[in-house]
Amino acid sequence: LNELMYQTGNPDLKLSRQVTANMQYNWIPRRNFSTTFFAQYFGEYDLYVPVFTPYDGGKALLRGYDTDGTYHRTQVGLSFNLHLAGNKIQLAAQPSVYFYRMTGHYDISKTPFSIHTSATFYLNDFYFQASYQTPERTVQGNRAVYYKDRDFYQLLAGWSKCGWNVRLTAINMFRSDWIGATQTLNSPLYSETRLVGGNYFHRRLNLSVTYTLNYGKKVQQGNEVGEQSGAASAIMK
């Protein structure tokens, strides 16, 4: 990589074994309210991870990979959806907790909390939405990296009629920097923190104008802003 860091391969690397399990329970006590409990597990065994050893008499480091690690990721959460005022107001929230555990060459334990929320209001042909998402914090197994991005918030206003849909979205309007995430690696001989740039978490305005042609097949319009309906599930990323 540079004069202080060299890299080598490992022909003895083995394939890892993976296990995935999912559980979900939906509860709809009223027509305008629904909730979902979900739990998900992902395990990876004998995964390869980066290892660092002294090189050239300790003047540099040699980066390689070894099959030495076990990775566990469990997510437990709830999803709520509430419709008010004849479905003109829709509220949604999805709080969840992750349990990360990594053993072997790296000993990592993290328990981050996250929540996604949104509120949508429909007024005749107009619709408005506000949404917020906490930073995502994950442990990336094969890289032994702790990853944390930024929180995300947006305001949306739109108009839809006769096949036309015009939407204006204001995203992260109070954030002027271009930092998207941080990645941290800690090992006995080497540690690093990387800043990941990008425009996804930077402030911006998006304007969208679309027109739907009702030809040949009946087209169902509506749900312009991802209207919440029924109980939602979640997928781990």
Where are the regions a protein language model picked out?
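Flexible, solvent-exposed coil segments and beta strand-coil junctions
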Residues: 1-7, 17, 51-61, 94-100, ...
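A general structural signal for short secondary-structure junctions and capping/turn motifs
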Residues: 15, 25-28, 158, 197-199
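Gram-negative outer-membrane beta-barrel proteins
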Residues: 1, 31-33, 43-51, 86-90, ...
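Conserved C-terminal beta-signal and adjacent last beta-strands/turns
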Residues: 109-237
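Outer membrane beta-barrel strand-and-loop segments of large Gram-negative receptors
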Residues: 8-14, 20, 26-27, 34-93, ...
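Transmembrane beta-strands of outer-membrane beta-barrel proteins
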Residues: 24-26, 36-40, 77-79, 92-96, ...
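Short beta-strand segments enriched in hydrophobic/aromatic residues
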Residues: 27-29, 41-43, 82-84, 97-99, ...
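Electropositive, surface-exposed helix/loop patches at the edges of structured domains
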Residues: 20-28, 205-212
